[in-house]
UniProtKB/Swiss-Prot annotation:
It comes from Brucella abortus biovar 1 (strain 9-941). Pfam families: GATase_6, SIS. It is found in: Cytoplasm. GO terms for cellular component: cytosol. The gene is glmS. Homodimer. GO terms for biological process: carbohydrate metabolic process; fructose 6-phosphate metabolic process; protein N-linked glycosylation; UDP-N-acetylglucosamine metabolic process. This is Glutamine--fructose-6-phosphate aminotransferase [isomerizing]. One of its GO terms (molecular function) is carbohydrate derivative binding. It catalyses: D-fructose 6-phosphate + L-glutamine = D-glucosamine 6-phosphate + L-glutamate.
């Protein structure tokens, strides 16, 4: 969600802050700003909208100084306008914040009763005034922040800059991630390693309750009990090449075309294609002792989890619950200690998913995670971590992270099946071989981009779209609908095809496109029956199938997208591509901001 950067160094800081903020754009934002110290005096520049507006402001009104903080804001409290943008300042400090201060109304009422004037609608301004209040009592900046943190309820990552002190940055974390970066005679704070990549690859992640005091020469970290602690220092894998779109129009398009390569890398991490076996050393879980699996996630990751449910149940004969994290965490679900709790998150910082993990951990369950950021909080709090080797995903709408999540969990399903005796060695080799072929089939689908883009001219003119699928194509239908909603802003819904007669069929008329995901598998004839019901009511069908399915459908369609024939096991990996491309090219035709769609954030670090 919001992005934070803080730098204390020896070079002009404003351009460095803006550079870092550009790397945080993928998180989603609606305004931006920076503050610096020069000769002990605080100054700031803010702008509504994109960073280019802030850059224009800085071109006319430069901000000198070698220490500063910056922020990209995703509005939670207060409208997305300049006066609500961060940093917020008082006569004594500047502060930036990612998260939600749940008791801000109570704090604001108390501070206003003391005569303090609020200029914004944000929860963050209450933090600025609260710390200023302690400074005015004669406390040092370190003492003031330390004494205020226990009074803040909710989720927050904070960075402070203090009037008159060019040797000090303070950061604090409770919920949203915050990393410390180590340089030569300079130090950094950032929401993630990507923001810090131009400056350092040496970082530490603060844990919940930590607060950090940075000078040019190093950092002192304290836990929630104000005891000095050390956090592991690690090398970040992110590099400066990450911000390039290459020859592609958008990051999303680039990331779609990266899928064959990153899926290959992810699969090779778990499977030995030479022997046709699972790499047991990469698994770290004894599935023979697991009697039930709970997979919990949000958004696109939840749809990946739901596909995986089919795999684990059908191949490994392992009962699975797939849950939306924001619901699971409040259900107070009874859990067996012989269950395995698995959590899926691209960022590894998704707030509801992390809270669900901690609930399961408190119940004594073994914790596994499928994450794309191996240094993330979810990864650090897991007993077993299964990385998706997708590389950084900049587009807000997930593409390659989704298919890499599928790849990792497909591999785990084979491992579970073998460990539980549900398949023999020959079947294991068959399934591993099928997965090894997935990147080749995906490359064939990518060559259909122009054909798929042509279908989108009609899609871009409608207001509603229905997606249908059966089996593993049902969660793909939900994912396809989500993609279209996210980036084209067209209302779309994904349904199990067998549910058509239980309500959605009432929506069908000649204005309603219905996208049907229907590989010619054992469920194909059932899906054809549903298509006939749509056609009988004038619905316009876009059929995504293979050659065999296209030849046997005998139904007039608005368009038919013919994919290569693939084994049922890997069809979700292959059929994910056309639903991504349909959403992408529809959004391009509609002129939306594909990589940073309105109101959305890449990493949802608050409830």
């Amino acid at each position: 969600m919001c992005g934070i950067i803080g730098i204390i160094g020896n070079d002009e800081v404003a351009p460095r802050l803006v550079d870092a903020l550009k790397r945080l754009e993928y998180r989603g934002y609606d305004s931006a700003g920076i503050a610096t110290l020069q000769n002990g005096r605080l100054d700031r520049r803010r702008a509504e909208g994109k960073l280019v507006n802030l850059e224009k402001r800085l071109a006319g009104e430069p901000l000198p100084g070698v220490i500063g903080i910056g922020h990209t804001r995703w509005a939670t409290h207060g409208r997305p306008v300049e006066h609500n943008a961060h940093p917020h300042i008082t006569t004594r400090l500047a502060v930036v914040h990612n998260g939600i201060i749940e008791n801000f109304a109570e704090l604001r009422a108390m501070l206003e009763a003391e005569g303090r004037k609020f200029e914004t609608e944000t929860d963050t301004e209450a933090v600025a005034h609260l710390v200023t209040r302690e400074l005015e009592k004669g406390k040092s900046p370190v003492e003031a922040v330390r004494d205020c943190l226990p009074h803040l309820k909710g989720a927050f990552a904070l960075a402070f800059l203090f009037e008159g002190d060019e040797e000090l940055l303070i950061g604090a974390r409770q919920g949203p991630p915050l990393a410390v970066g180590y340089g030569e005679g300079e130090m950094f704070l950032g929401s993630d390693a990507i923001a810090l990549a131009p400056f350092t690859d040496t970082i530490s992640y603060l844990e919940d309750g930590d607060w950090a005091v940075l000078t040019r020469n190093g950092v002192s970290i304290y836990d929630e009990n104000n005891k000095p602690v050390e956090r592991p220092v690690q090398k970040s894998q992110n590099t400066n090449m990450l911000v390039s779109k290459g020859n592609h129009r958008h990051f999303m398009q680039k990331e779609m075309f990266e899928q064959p390569e990153v899926i290959s890398h992810t699969l090779a991490n778990y499977l030995d294609f030479t022997t046709g076996k699972v790499r047991k050393e990469a698994i770290g879980i004894d599935f023979s002792k697991v009697d039930r699996l709970t997979i919990t996630a949000c958004g696109t990751a939840y749809y990946a989890a739901t596909v995986a449910k089919y795999w684990f149940e059908q191949i490994a004969r392992l009962p699975v619950d797939s849950d939306i994290a924001s619901e699971f965490r409040y259900r107070e679900m009874p859990l067996s200690k012989d269950s395995l709790a698995m959590f899926v998150s691209q960022s590894g910082e998704t707030a509801d998913t992390l809270a669900s993990l901690r609930y399961c951990k408190a119940q004594g369950l073994k914790i596994a995670s499928v994450v794309n950021v191996t240094g993330s909080t979810i990864a650090r709090e897991s007993d077993a971590v299964f990385p998706t080797l997708a590389g950084p995903e900049i587009g807000v709408a997930s593409t390659k992270a989704f298919t890499c999540q599928l790849s990792a969990m497909a591999s785990l399903a084979i491992a579970a099946a073998r460990a539980r005796g549900a398949i023999d060695e020959v079947r294991e080799q068959e399934l591993v071989h099928q997965l090894s072929e997935a990147p080749r089939f995906i490359n064939q689908v990518l060559k259909l981009e122009d054909q798929i883009a042509a279908v989108c001219h009609d899609l871009s003119k409608v207001n509603h779209v229905l997606y249908l699928g059966r089996g593993t194509s049902f969660p793909l239908a939900m994912e396809g609908a989500l993609k279209l909603k996210e980036i084209s802003y067209i209302h779309a819904e994904g349904y199990a095809a067998g549910e058509l007669k239980h309500g959605p069929i009432a929506l069908i008329d000649e204005t309603m496109p219905v996208i049907v995901i229907a590989p010619s598998d054992r469920l194909y004839e059932k899906t054809v029956s549903n298509m006939q019901e749509v056609a009988a009511r004038g619905g316009r069908i876009i059929l995504i199938t293979d050659k065999k399915g296209a030849e046997s459908a005998s139904i007039d369609t608005m368009a038919t997208i013919v994919l290569p024939e693939v084994p049922e096991f890997i069809s979700p990996l292959v059929y994910a591509l056309p639903i991504q491309m349909l959403a992408y090219h529809t959004a391009v035709l509609m002129g939306t901001d594909v990589d940073q769609p309105r109101n959305l954030a890449k990493s949802v670090t608050v409830e």
